[in-house]
From Swiss-Prot:
Listed name of the protein: Ice-binding protein
Keywords: Glycoprotein, Secreted, Signal
Places the protein is found: Secreted
Species this protein is from: Flammulina populicola
Keyword tRNA processing: no
InterPro entries per the UniProt record, alphabetical: Ice-bd_prot (IPR021884)
Keyword Calcium: no
Gene Ontology CC annotations of this record: extracellular region
Site keyed Ice-binding: positions: T64, S146, T218
Length: 247
């Protein structure tokens, strides 16, 4: 009976024409990047990133493992592992100013997401979300969150989720976050105060707003964006921004 009631409730949410969940978190110029980091992006090749990478205030020395080729104009680099461009604060104008704005917007987005009030759910399942089926809303966790089995997020294309996580976030090896009902990765925001680990062969979905380090391990994927206030580490990983890069 519990499953039947849940199924009816979820169906009602998905079929509703009214957007459910909190007001969207605005990324500003940070939305131009698949990966944006303040202290560097390191990579064990080959990884694949289908949009731009940016690092600031650290310079180009903070981008490793991509075999960068500088543009003749000096404002960006390219890599065979990156479909877009790689920008660093030490490159030529207008890159430094553009990155400063993007980082400012990233920090504001994190602050906005973490400071939302009146959560719909607090410490759901004590942070153990493996196997759960969730509905749109604001989720607050005063400790860490672990996902050890597939997680299902339901909703339509205008519905939203915000996860406020005071500790770490970990996705176990081989585990998937599945979005159903037309829910978009761009509308799922994970604001994490501690480190994020996406284990080998797992599949993560959503916008990662990390206060500290984000690690994406071997053959794992992130469909969304990684916006970190310290370092991003890729190990033969894939980062996919759905749709048009920067949009």
């Amino acid at each position: 009976m519990t499953f039947s009631i849940l199924s009816i409730f979820v169906f009602g949410l998905i079929s509703s024409s009214v957007a459910l969940g909190p007001a969207p978190v605005l990324l500003g110029k940070a939305e131009n990047f698949a990966i944006l980091s303040e202290t560097g992006v390191s990579n064990v090749p080959d990884s694949s990133v289908n949009c731009d990478i940016g690092v600031s205030p650290i310079g180009a020395s903070g981008v490793t493992g991509f075999s960068l080729t500088g543009d003749s104009g000096g404002s960006f680099s390219t890599s065979k592992q990156v479909t877009g461009r790689v920008y660093a604060s030490t490159y030529g104008d207008p890159t430094p100013a553009s990155l400063t704005t993007a980082v400012f917007d990233m920090e504001n987005a994190y602050k906005d997401a973490q400071e939302r009030i009146d959560p719909d759910f607090t410490n759901l399942h004590t942070g153990a979300l493996g196997g759960a089926i969730l509905v749109p809303g604001l989720y607050k966790f005063t400790t860490g969150v672990s996902i050890t089995a597939d997680l299902v997020l339901t909703g339509g294309p205008t519905d939203t989720y915000i996860f406020q996580i005071a500790g770490t976030l970990s996705l176990a090896a081989g585990v998937k976050i599945n979005l159903v009902g037309g829910l978009l990765p761009a509308n799922v925001v994970w604001a994490v105060a501690d480190s994020v680990t996406v284990a080998a062969t797992s599949s993560f979905q959503g916008i990662l707003l990390g206060k500290t380090q984000v690690v994406v391990n071997t053959n794992a994927s992130v469909e969304g964006r990684i916006l970190a206030q310290t370092a991003v580490v890729l190990q033969k990983a894939t980062v996919i921004v759905p749709g048009v890069c920067g949009a």
